[in-house]
Swiss-Prot record:
Region annotation (Disordered) ranges: 169-188
Native organism: Citrobacter freundii
Protein name (Swiss-Prot/TrEMBL): Glyceraldehyde-3-phosphate dehydrogenase
SMART domains the record matches: Gp_dh_N (SM00846)
Gene label: gap
UniProt family annotation: Belongs to the glyceraldehyde-3-phosphate dehydrogenase family.
InterPro entries hit by this protein: GlycerAld/Erythrose_P_DH, GlycerAld_3-P_DH_AS, GlycerAld_3-P_DH_cat, GlycerAld_3-P_DH_NAD(P)-bd, Glyceraldehyde-3-P_DH_1, NAD(P)-bd_dom_sf
Keywords in alphabetical order: Cytoplasm, Glycolysis, NAD, Nucleotide-binding, Oxidoreductase
Amino acid sequence: IVFRAAQERSDIEIVAINDLLDADYMAYMLKYDSTHGRFNGTVEVKDGHLIVNGKKIRVTAERDPANLKWDEVGVDVVAEATGLFLTDETARKHITAGAKKVVLTGPSKDNTPMFVKGANFDKYEGQDIVSNASCTTNCLAPLAKVINDNFGIIEGLMTTVHATTATQKTVDGPSHKDWRGGRGASQNIIPSSTGAAKAVGKVLPELNGKLTGMAFRVPTPNVSVVDLTVRLEKAASYEEIKKAIKAASEGPMKGVLGYTEDDVVSTDFNGEVCTSVFDAKAGIALNDNFVKLV
């Protein structure tokens, strides 16, 4: 997904990939995707490296990032997407290998700073290793910021109805640490934990301790939804809340926070470029201080 997204941009050039998979299989996985469809371009393998749209991409299979020699191919930024090197100490091996910056594609497991577009990019001070947090935090944080900036959040609970992920089981199987997580993904709605809401407190310190949440894993292949229920400091009608979110989506958060009043369902957001889209018709208010946002 990182590769496909980068290919859509003229200001990003992918020069190298490190994976324990062989190049032929990597080419196959890039060409064909059950969720996002076929790759829009040419993909070949030559001398163990990928040739994508006529450009060579170096392929390596190093287990230790320190051995990657990123400087040989002029790497500026590494997208650390293995899920294995989520601390400053381990991710710094990419810097040792010659990269200038590292972006972790999941929440860090130490105090590596997290940055979410639409929430705290303005706080970035040039750190060479950062986390982009989780997909759920990227969905929740921009919305929470708009609501807190305009109306003030006293406290809130979040539920994410989350699409199936690759870590789940196709049928019931052993899962010693998470018994429910070992149940068949296509057969069940599975309650699960998530640190996404608490992580919002790291990117928006003013909300630290005010949000927590949980997840339900559901049998859909892609697209998840966040249900945010909050108590507001400043009373506001649901229409006023919608107006504030729409203004943000057309102004400072354009391209990050979307807004729709259409009768949409989850598959309508497959390939969505915004990290968060507010569904204006799906939310409800109990009163002017207690509201559920989707």
